[in-house]
């Protein structure tokens, strides 16, 4: 009778998302309305500002170059980034987003803290994988993580100190902040690296919290042609409702309007590779498959069934490069057709 946790789960299950796409209106009209609502929920856009872009270091690493830089995404807030650029003709850009880890250096396969090696062995050296797959790689440090916010042992502030919660008091969300940084990073790379990087065909990818930001950024920005979120796309009622997750996963009010599979339909005019681990305890396979089926139905309606892929890895909460990258590479070009 007095089980409040069970009650909120039941309430979630019986709440039909009010903006679910039902096919009764043109897809483009629904997408416009849905994106406007999602933008409101994420508290976007933020106020524009000068990018104050600055190169911090530049290195020739043989087959590729590395440019470390930062830029201003909001007045007085700077975003650290690294851009890895293969030699030769401009390659498609892959945006690589770390989840709850010690920072973006993991994407380059660099060990700085205890436990980093385990993260890298879990397939999280995204930038190096992207280079091998034929992309340029942009690494963006997530707010409240790594050099943008961590403890002495490298632990992200959003997980240990709930540092992302004050954003809610200002009507903001951590996801919205991170999405904004990704969108502004695309602006910066498109402006200053246009001759060295192909930004007409952008892929965005990440695992766990990085997958979540990949997902929402791809919902919001059509410049991202292929989204590859890993261990993050799963119906809310099967993941962040019944199980404990970091506060940075939550967007106030979102479940009244959308489930995660509904939001995935915002990408049904582009391409989506959902990656999951069949033994992932945080994002159970059943909930992942619900999201996938809902999204794929709209992709099919749009004549793009082949542009919505579910990659099932054989283990738990990690990335699966051998299974995922071949699908992403195919869709990087399919997304343009």
Regions found by a protein language model. Give the residues of each.
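N-terminal targeting or regulatory segments adjacent to alpha/beta-hydrolase or S9 domains
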Residues: 1-65, 337
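Proline/glycine-enriched tight loop/beta-turn segments at coil->beta junctions
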Residues: 76-79, 86-93, 100-103
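Mobile cap/lid helix-loop segments that gate and shape the active-site cleft of serine hydrolases
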Residues: 184, 224-269, 281-289, 300-301
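Alpha/beta-hydrolase fold nucleophile elbow
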Residues: 195-208
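Glycine-rich nucleophile elbow surrounding the catalytic serine of serine-hydrolase chemistry
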Residues: 206-216
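C-terminal catalytic histidine-bearing segment of alpha/beta-hydrolase fold enzymes
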Residues: 293, 299-337
